[in-house]
UniProtKB/Swiss-Prot annotation:
Quaternary organization: The system is composed of three essential subunits: KdpA, KdpB and KdpC.
Membrane-crossing residue ranges in chain numbering: 6-26
Alphabetized UniProt keyword annotations: ATP-binding, Cell inner membrane, Cell membrane, Ion transport, Membrane, Nucleotide-binding, Potassium, Potassium transport, Transmembrane, Transmembrane helix, Transport
Name of this chain's protein: Potassium-transporting ATPase KdpC subunit
Function field: Part of the high-affinity ATP-driven potassium transport (or Kdp) system, which catalyzes the hydrolysis of ATP coupled with the electrogenic transport of potassium into the cytoplasm. This subunit acts as a catalytic chaperone that increases the ATP-binding affinity of the ATP-hydrolyzing subunit KdpB by the formation of a transient KdpB/KdpC/ATP ternary complex.
Protein source organism: Geotalea uraniireducens (strain Rf4)
Organism domain of life: Bacteria
InterPro entries the record matches: KdpC (IPR003820)
Stated family: Belongs to the KdpC family.
Gene Ontology, cellular component aspect: plasma membrane
Protein backbone atom coordinates (compact mmCIF):
# COMPACT_ATOMS: atom_id res chain seq x y z
CA UNK A 1 0.00 0.00 0.00
CA UNK A 2 2.93 2.29 0.74
CA UNK A 3 4.17 2.04 -2.87
CA UNK A 4 0.76 2.41 -4.50
CA UNK A 5 -0.14 5.80 -2.91
CA UNK A 6 2.67 7.72 -4.66
CA UNK A 7 1.87 5.94 -7.94
CA UNK A 8 -1.81 6.95 -7.75
CA UNK A 9 -0.90 10.51 -6.75
CA UNK A 10 1.65 10.67 -9.60
CA UNK A 11 -1.02 9.41 -12.03
CA UNK A 12 -3.59 12.00 -10.89
CA UNK A 13 -1.15 14.93 -10.92
CA UNK A 14 0.24 14.12 -14.37
CA UNK A 15 -3.23 13.46 -15.79
CA UNK A 16 -4.26 16.95 -14.68
CA UNK A 17 -1.02 18.52 -15.94
CA UNK A 18 -0.76 16.70 -19.28
CA UNK A 19 -4.47 16.35 -19.98
CA UNK A 20 -5.69 19.73 -18.79
CA UNK A 21 -3.12 22.38 -17.91
CA UNK A 22 -0.65 21.81 -20.77
CA UNK A 23 -3.30 21.72 -23.56
CA UNK A 24 -5.00 24.83 -22.13
CA UNK A 25 -1.71 26.77 -21.99
CA UNK A 26 -0.60 25.73 -25.49
CA UNK A 27 -4.04 26.51 -26.95
CA UNK A 28 -4.06 29.94 -25.25
CA UNK A 29 -0.59 30.75 -26.60
CA UNK A 30 -1.60 29.58 -30.09
CA UNK A 31 -4.70 31.80 -30.07
CA UNK A 32 -2.66 34.78 -28.87
CA UNK A 33 0.33 34.37 -31.21
CA UNK A 34 -1.24 32.68 -34.28
CA UNK A 35 -4.98 33.44 -34.10
CA UNK A 36 -5.79 32.65 -37.76
CA UNK A 37 -3.88 29.35 -37.77
CA UNK A 38 -5.27 28.31 -34.38
CA UNK A 39 -8.77 28.64 -35.80
CA UNK A 40 -8.09 26.52 -38.89
CA UNK A 41 -6.64 29.01 -41.42
CA UNK A 42 -10.06 29.52 -42.98
CA UNK A 43 -10.34 31.50 -46.20
CA UNK A 44 -13.34 33.79 -46.50
CA UNK A 45 -15.04 35.48 -49.43
CA UNK A 46 -15.87 39.20 -49.62
CA UNK A 47 -18.97 38.74 -47.48
CA UNK A 48 -16.98 36.99 -44.73
CA UNK A 49 -18.40 33.53 -45.46
CA UNK A 50 -15.88 30.72 -44.90
CA UNK A 51 -15.26 28.93 -48.20
CA UNK A 52 -12.41 26.61 -47.26
CA UNK A 53 -9.18 26.18 -45.37
CA UNK A 54 -5.68 26.88 -46.63
CA UNK A 55 -4.62 23.67 -44.86
CA UNK A 56 -7.04 21.12 -46.37
CA UNK A 57 -7.47 20.27 -50.04
CA UNK A 58 -10.78 21.14 -51.68
CA UNK A 59 -12.44 19.20 -54.50
CA UNK A 60 -12.36 20.89 -57.92
CA UNK A 61 -13.42 19.01 -61.05
CA UNK A 62 -14.65 21.77 -63.38
CA UNK A 63 -12.32 22.31 -66.36
CA UNK A 64 -12.29 26.04 -65.51
CA UNK A 65 -10.29 25.36 -62.35
CA UNK A 66 -6.92 23.91 -61.46
CA UNK A 67 -7.35 20.46 -59.96
CA UNK A 68 -5.75 19.33 -56.69
CA UNK A 69 -4.05 16.07 -55.82
CA UNK A 70 -6.40 13.11 -55.67
CA UNK A 71 -8.01 12.59 -52.28
CA UNK A 72 -7.22 9.42 -50.38
CA UNK A 73 -10.53 9.57 -48.52
CA UNK A 74 -13.12 7.25 -49.97
CA UNK A 75 -16.49 8.22 -48.46
CA UNK A 76 -16.32 11.71 -49.95
CA UNK A 77 -13.30 13.62 -51.16
CA UNK A 78 -11.10 15.58 -48.77
CA UNK A 79 -12.91 14.44 -45.63
CA UNK A 80 -10.53 15.32 -42.75
CA UNK A 81 -12.27 12.86 -40.43
CA UNK A 82 -11.06 9.87 -42.47
CA UNK A 83 -7.72 11.10 -43.74
CA UNK A 84 -4.75 8.86 -44.30
CA UNK A 85 -2.78 7.43 -47.17
CA UNK A 86 -3.51 4.12 -48.82
CA UNK A 87 -0.17 2.62 -47.72
CA UNK A 88 -0.11 0.72 -51.00
CA UNK A 89 3.40 0.08 -52.27
CA UNK A 90 4.58 1.07 -55.76
CA UNK A 91 4.21 -2.51 -57.03
CA UNK A 92 0.76 -3.12 -55.53
CA UNK A 93 -1.64 -4.06 -58.39
CA UNK A 94 -4.49 -1.95 -56.93
CA UNK A 95 -2.21 1.07 -56.67
CA UNK A 96 -0.94 0.60 -60.23
CA UNK A 97 -4.50 0.30 -61.55
CA UNK A 98 -5.62 3.43 -59.67
CA UNK A 99 -2.67 5.45 -60.95
CA UNK A 100 -3.15 4.11 -64.49
CA UNK A 101 -6.84 5.10 -64.41
CA UNK A 102 -5.93 8.58 -63.18
CA UNK A 103 -3.29 9.01 -65.91
CA UNK A 104 -5.80 7.93 -68.57
CA UNK A 105 -8.40 10.31 -67.15
CA UNK A 106 -5.93 13.22 -67.32
CA UNK A 107 -4.89 12.30 -70.87
CA UNK A 108 -8.60 12.27 -71.80
CA UNK A 109 -8.82 15.93 -70.68
CA UNK A 110 -6.03 16.89 -73.07
CA UNK A 111 -3.02 16.81 -70.78
CA UNK A 112 -0.13 15.37 -72.76
CA UNK A 113 3.40 14.31 -71.98
CA UNK A 114 4.68 13.47 -68.54
CA UNK A 115 2.17 13.93 -65.78
CA UNK A 116 3.56 15.03 -62.39
CA UNK A 117 3.11 12.37 -59.72
CA UNK A 118 1.11 14.67 -57.47
CA UNK A 119 -1.75 14.72 -60.00
CA UNK A 120 -2.14 10.93 -59.89
CA UNK A 121 -1.03 9.97 -56.37
CA UNK A 122 -2.68 11.06 -53.14
CA UNK A 123 -0.51 12.61 -50.45
CA UNK A 124 0.26 10.80 -47.20
CA UNK A 125 -2.64 12.52 -45.44
CA UNK A 126 -4.90 12.42 -48.48
CA UNK A 127 -5.81 16.06 -47.82
CA UNK A 128 -2.85 18.03 -49.15
CA UNK A 129 -3.96 21.50 -50.37
CA UNK A 130 -0.86 22.00 -52.51
CA UNK A 131 0.41 20.79 -55.85
CA UNK A 132 3.80 21.38 -57.44
CA UNK A 133 4.20 24.31 -59.84
CA UNK A 134 4.76 21.69 -62.57
CA UNK A 135 1.39 20.07 -61.78
CA UNK A 136 -0.27 23.48 -62.08
CA UNK A 137 1.52 24.31 -65.33
CA UNK A 138 0.48 21.11 -67.13
CA UNK A 139 -3.13 22.16 -66.43
CA UNK A 140 -2.70 25.65 -67.92
CA UNK A 141 -3.84 24.75 -71.48
CA UNK A 142 -7.08 23.15 -70.21
CA UNK A 143 -7.91 26.04 -67.87
CA UNK A 144 -6.98 28.65 -70.51
CA UNK A 145 -9.26 27.02 -73.08
CA UNK A 146 -12.16 26.65 -70.61
CA UNK A 147 -11.89 30.28 -69.45
CA UNK A 148 -10.93 31.93 -72.73
CA UNK A 149 -7.71 33.25 -71.19
CA UNK A 150 -4.19 33.22 -72.59
CA UNK A 151 -1.71 30.63 -71.41
CA UNK A 152 0.73 33.45 -70.57
CA UNK A 153 -1.78 35.02 -68.17
CA UNK A 154 -2.24 31.72 -66.39
CA UNK A 155 1.48 30.92 -66.24
CA UNK A 156 2.08 34.32 -64.63
CA UNK A 157 -0.69 33.61 -62.13
CA UNK A 158 0.82 30.21 -61.26
CA UNK A 159 4.24 31.82 -60.83
CA UNK A 160 2.77 34.56 -58.62
CA UNK A 161 0.96 32.01 -56.42
CA UNK A 162 3.98 29.68 -56.09
CA UNK A 163 5.17 29.50 -52.49
CA UNK A 164 8.88 28.98 -51.83
CA UNK A 165 10.39 26.33 -49.59
CA UNK A 166 9.80 26.94 -45.89
CA UNK A 167 12.79 28.67 -44.29
CA UNK A 168 14.49 28.39 -47.68
CA UNK A 169 15.35 24.70 -47.34
CA UNK A 170 12.35 22.71 -46.08
CA UNK A 171 10.08 20.99 -48.57
CA UNK A 172 9.61 22.00 -52.18
CA UNK A 173 7.98 24.87 -54.02
CA UNK A 174 4.21 24.49 -53.99
CA UNK A 175 0.96 26.08 -55.11
CA UNK A 176 -2.13 26.18 -52.90
CA UNK A 177 -4.92 25.09 -55.27
CA UNK A 178 -7.79 26.82 -53.43
CA UNK A 179 -5.94 30.14 -53.29
CA UNK A 180 -4.91 29.81 -56.95
CA UNK A 181 -8.51 29.16 -58.02
CA UNK A 182 -9.81 32.09 -55.97
CA UNK A 183 -7.28 34.37 -57.70
CA UNK A 184 -8.38 32.88 -61.02
CA UNK A 185 -12.00 33.80 -60.26
CA UNK A 186 -10.94 37.38 -59.42
CA UNK A 187 -9.13 37.70 -62.77
CA UNK A 188 -12.06 36.32 -64.74
CA UNK A 189 -14.57 38.86 -63.45
Amino acid sequence: MKEIKPAILFFIVFTILCGGVYPAVVTSIAHAVFPKQAKGSFITDKSGREIGSALIGQPFSDARYFWPRPSATTDFGYNPMTSGGSNSGPTNPDFLKTVGDRVKSLHDTGITGNIPADLVEASASGLDPHITPEAAKVQVPRVAKARGMTMEELKKLVDARTEDRQLGFLGEQRVNVLELNLELDKLSR
